């Protein structure tokens, strides 16, 4: 099933996780209502995607072509210097934030009006649409709250505070490329 709008999906995943959920990758490619599923990651991931049996609907984008990890790491390290007090920022703590920056910055490479992000460990079970009958995208919200994310967000962006009880973090999200480009 394809949506009424034509767009691609990005799945940001490490090579280890791509292998760990290998049985799910076929379902992601089969059921997402997109033109192409682009797995985003390192050069090692490129090899795994190329060796997979996912077909022509699967592709690869090098994460460094979107935004290098070191750029995000160094930015967070600089902004959090007062908290770190000379300690090294653990690279593992940057991973989740890096994923969010990749999802946003992909808008600069995207040629379509929309693109979707999809978590590689989330398995679609049937065909679905990300748009209603009038072509408006669906927007998922959750009730998750992870205090450490908001502490970090307020450190990086002091003027941004949590003002609604819902979370906008979801296993999948549709992005309007133009809105995202304006936002960033």
Annotate each language-model stretch with its function.
Residues 37-42:
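Short internal beta-strands
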Residues 125-184:
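Conserved catalytic core of nucleotide-sugar-dependent glycosyltransferases
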Residues 1-26:
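N-proximal low-complexity "stem/linker" segments adjacent to membrane-targeting elements
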């Amino acid at each position: 099933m394809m949506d009424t709008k034509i767009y691609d999906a990005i799945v940001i995943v490490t090579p280890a996780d791509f292998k760990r959920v290998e049985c799910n990758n076929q379902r992601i490619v089969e059921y997402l209502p997109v033109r192409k599923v682009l797995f985003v990651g390192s050069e090692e991931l490129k090899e795994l995607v190329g060796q997979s049996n996912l077909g022509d609907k699967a592709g690869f984008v090098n994460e460094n072509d979107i935004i290098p990890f070191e750029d995000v790491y160094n930015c967070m390290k600089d902004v959090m210097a007062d908290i770190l007090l000379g300690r090294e920022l653990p690279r593992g703590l940057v991973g989740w934030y890096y994923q969010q920056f990749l999802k946003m910055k992909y808008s600069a490479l995207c040629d379509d009006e929309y693109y979707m992000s999809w978590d590689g460990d989330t398995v679609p079970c049937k065909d679905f649409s990300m748009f209603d009958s009038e072509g408006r995208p669906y927007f998922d919200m959750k009730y998750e709250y992870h205090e450490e994310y908001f502490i970090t967000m307020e450190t990086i962006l002091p003027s941004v505070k949590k003002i609604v009880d819902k979370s906008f973090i979801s296993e999948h999200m549709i992005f309007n490329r133009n809105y995202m480009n304006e936002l960033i």
